[in-house]
Swiss-Prot record:
The organism's taxonomic lineage, starting at the top: Bacteria, Bacillati, Bacillota, Bacilli, Bacillales
Listed name of the protein: Processive diacylglycerol beta-glucosyltransferase
Organism of origin: Staphylococcus haemolyticus (strain JCSC1435)
The keyword Cell membrane belongs to this UniProt entry's keyword annotation: yes
NCBIfam families: PRK13608.1
Single GO MF annotation: 1,2-diacylglycerol 3-glucosyltransferase activity
A single cellular component GO annotation: plasma membrane
Domain of life: Bacteria
Protein family according to the UniProt entry: Belongs to the glycosyltransferase 28 family. UgtP subfamily.
Length: 391
C-alpha cells in the first residue's frame, strides 16, 4: 500500500454521465481505503481547456443519437490514420501539459477516451504511469494510449480485443467496469415493491427514458406491453423530463400496475426488484444491470458504442436488441410469457458477472503506485516534467 505522499490525477469527460460516474466510483473507493498519503484530483480536461467549443460538441453529441446518427457513425468507425489527421487528437494539449506541470501527479488515470495523451507519450518520453479505464464492452481506437502502463477492461473478450490490437496481455486487467458498490448490496425486493404499492408476485418491467430525455412512444409501449403481458407491472423512469412524467401520469393514473417516476436516486433498488429492463445500452447502466443479473432490452441503439455494447450483450445472452417499439413489445411478451427463457438469461448473467470491480481496480492502481516508488526516488519528479521544456 501507499506509504509515501502520492497523487493520482484522473482525467475524465462529461459527454454523458457514465465517465463521471466511473470517476466518482473510483474516488469513493479510494477514499474508503483511508490512505492518508494519497491525494486524488479529477479534471474534465476538454471542458476546462475549451469550455465553449466543448459545450457545443456536447450538444452535438447528445443530438447525434437522434438527428446525426450517420455522422457519429462515421466518426466512431473511422480508421486510426484518419484520427491522426484530425484536430481531436490534439484537443486539450496545452491544458494537459499545464495540469501535469502544476499537479505533478505520480499516476494518471483516464476514465474518458483522451487521444491527446498519445501526443505526450509519443513525443515526450515521460515515464509517469498511465492507466486507462475502458467504460464500454468493445474496443474502440480512441481508448488506446501508446506506452500506457495498464488498461482496465470489462471482460476477457475485451482483453482479447486489446491483445489483438497489439497491447501486451500483461498490461491488461479484467476488473469489470467500475460501478458503485451499492449494486452488490442485498435489497429486500418484497418490501421495496410493497412500499410503492406494487405486487411482489408480478413480473416487474423497468423502463427508462434515458439520460437525454427521449420522450416519445412510451405511452404506446406501456399500453401494448400490458395488453400482451397482462400479468406484468411496469415502472417507468422519466428522468428529468417533467413533461413526459406529467403526460404518462395522466394517461395511466387509474392503473394499479403502472408506476411513473421522475428522476430517481434509487435505480439500484429498482434494478434489484425488477425482472426485465428496457434501456439505453450505456456502459455504466448495462454494467449495473449485469451486476444485478437483470436481463435488458435495448431499444434502437445508436451506431457506435451504444450499438457495440448492445451487440455484445445480445451475443452473450444478457439482453436483446429491439429496433422498433413493436419489436420491444414482442420481446417483452415472449420473455414474460415464457419465464424459463427470462430465467436462463438471469442465470447466465449471475454466472459470468465480475464482482467488486471498483475495488479490484483501485487495489491494482495502488500496486502500480508502489512499484513506481523506487523509480521516483532515484529520478525524482522534476526531471520527468522538465522534459516538456526540452522537446
Amino acid at each position: 500500500m501507499v506509504t509515501q505522499n502520492k497523487k493520482i490525477l484522473i482525467i475524465t469527460g462529461s459527454f454523458g454521465n457514465g465517465h463521471l460516474q466511473v470517476t466518482q466510483s473510483v474516488v469513493n473507493q479510494l477514499n474508503e481505503m483511508n490512505l492518508s498519503h494519497l491525494s486524488v484530483i479529477e479534471h474534465d480536461l476538454f471542458m476546462e481547456a475549451h469550455p465553449i467549443l466543448t459545450s457545443i460538441c456536447k450538444k452535438w453529441y447528445i443530438n447525434s443519437f437522434k438527428y446525426f446518427r450517420n455522422m457519429y457513425k462515421n466518426f466512431y468507425y473511422s480508421r486510426p490514420d484518419e484520427l491522426d489527421k484530425c484536430f481531436y487528437k490534439y484537443y486539450g494539449l496545452n491544458k494537459l501539459i499545464n495540469l501535469l506541470l502544476k499537479e505533478k501527479p505520480d499516476l494518471i488515470l483516464l476514465t474518458f477516451p483522451t487521444p491527446v495523451m498519445s501526443v505526450l507519450t509519443e513525443q515526450f518520453n515521460i515515464n509517469i504511469p498511465i492507466a486507462t479505464v475502458m467504460t464500454d464492452y468493445r474496443l474502440q481506437k480512441n481508448w488506446i494510449t501508446p506506452n500506457s502502463h495498464r488498461y482496465y477492461v470489462a471482460t476477457d473478450d475485451t482483453k482479447r480485443d486489446f491483445v489483438n490490437a497489439g497491447i501486451p496481455a500483461s498490461d491488461i486487467k479484467v476488473t469489470g467496469i467500475p460501478i458503485s458498490d451499492k449494486f452488490e448490496s442485498d435489497i429486500d425486493k418484497v418490501a421495496w415493491l410493497k412500499k410503492h404499492n406494487l405486487n411482489p408476485d408480478k413480473p416487474t418491467i423497468l423502463m427508462s427514458a434515458g439520460a437525454f430525455g427521449v420522450s416519445k412512444g412510451f405511452d404506446y409501449m406501456i399500453d401494448n406491453i400490458l395488453q400482451k403481458s397482462p400479468q406484468s407491472q411496469i415502472v417507468m423512469v422519466c428522468g428529468r423530463s417533467k413533461g413526459l412524467k406529467r403526460t404518462l401520469e395522466m394517461q395511466f393514473k387509474s392503473y394499479d400496475n403502472v408506476l411513473i417516476l421522475g428522476y430517481t436516486k434509487h435505480m439500484n433498488e429498482w434494478m434489484a426488484s425488477s425482472q426485465l429492463m428496457i434501456t439505453k445500452p450505456g456502459g455504466i447502466t448495462i454494467s449495473e444491470g449485469l451486476t444485478r443479473s437483470l436481463p435488458m432490452i435495448f431499444l434502437n441503439p445508436a451506431p457506435g458504442q451504444e450499438l457495440e455494447n448492445a451487440l455484445y450483450f445480445q451475443d452473450k445472452s444478457y439482453g436483446k436488441i429491439a429496433n422498433t417499439p413493436e419489436e420491444a413489445i414482442d420481446i417483452v411478451s415472449d420473455l414474460t410469457n415464457h419465464e424459463y427463457r427470462l430465467q436462463a438469461m438471469t442465470n447466465k448473467m449471475t454466472e459470468e458477472k465480475v464482482n467488486h470491480s471498483t475495488y479490484r481496480l483501485c487495489t491494482d492502481l495502488l500496486n502500480i503506485l508502489d512499484s513506481s516508488s523506487q523509480q521516483q526516488e532515484i529520478y525524482g519528479k522534476v526531471p520527468l516534467y522538465a522534459r516538456f521544456f526540452v522537446k
